[in-house]
């Protein structure tokens, strides 16, 4: 399962402005900024805001040293303004305590303002190539269908069981490709309605519910 998800990502990955080379000096900044912006917001909405934001604040240091008013001004229209306040606070902490870099443990990441379990998992996996569990809406939908779990997505009990299932699926290598492949699968193939099961690399693992949703 993990291999076919990674293979599909290698051959069909989306081109997104925050997906830069792993050796890029902007990698970690782009990753944490995009994760904040993508919380409860679709990719197509985030892209122009991300590009404008990074042209004004190209790194953690520049973001940390600007005023909150400037941050909120660029964030205007994206909504959920607590995210803007939290990324500004986080940038200040990263500049002061982490030399404008990011901590690389789940515990330290979750100490930063606005970063929960899933966002920390995304940073670990995509920013550091370490094991990290991502449970955004797209990934949760894929995992629900793969596991045959029919419970409502956002129930505490459901999230707990999905977290355990996600741990089982974590590969031993290539964490970044697997995580990005899982997110891309949920965004482009395993959609909420009319999923394209005939194009899914793990369609044989889907429950009959996913097929029913195509009709």
Role assignments for model-derived ranges:
Residues 1-7, 206-211:
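Conserved small/polar residues in nucleotide/adenosyl-binding loops
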Residues 215:
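Post-transcriptional modification and biogenesis factors for structured RNAs
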Residues 8-196, 202-205:
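Catalytic cores of DNA base-excision repair glycosylases
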């Amino acid at each position: 399962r993990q291999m076919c998800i990674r293979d599909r990502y290698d051959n069909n990955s989306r081109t997104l402005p925050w997906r830069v080379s792993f050796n890029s000096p902007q990698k970690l900044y782009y990753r944490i900024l995009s994760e904040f912006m993508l919380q409860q917001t679709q990719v197509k909405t985030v892209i122009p805001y991300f590009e404008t934001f990074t042209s004004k604040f190209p790194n953690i240091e520049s973001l940390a040293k600007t005023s909150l008013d400037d941050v909120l001004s660029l964030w205007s229209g994206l909504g959920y303004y607590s995210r803007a306040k939290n990324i500004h606070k986080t940038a200040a902490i990263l500049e002061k305590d982490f030399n404008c870099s990011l901590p690389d443990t789940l515990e330290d990441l979750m100490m930063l303002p606005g970063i929960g379990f899933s966002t920390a998992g995304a940073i670990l996996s995509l920013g550091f190539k370490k094991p990290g569990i991502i449970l955004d809406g797209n990934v949760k939908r894929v995992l629900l269908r793969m596991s045959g779990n029919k419970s409502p997505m956002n129930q505490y009990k459901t999230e707990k069981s999905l977290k355990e299932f996600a741990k089982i699926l974590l590969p031993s290598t290539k964490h970044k490709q697997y995580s990005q492949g899982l997110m891309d699968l949920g965004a482009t193939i395993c959609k909420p309605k009319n999923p394209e099961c005939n194009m899914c690399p793990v369609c044989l693992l889907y429950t009959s519910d996913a097929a029913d949703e195509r009709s």
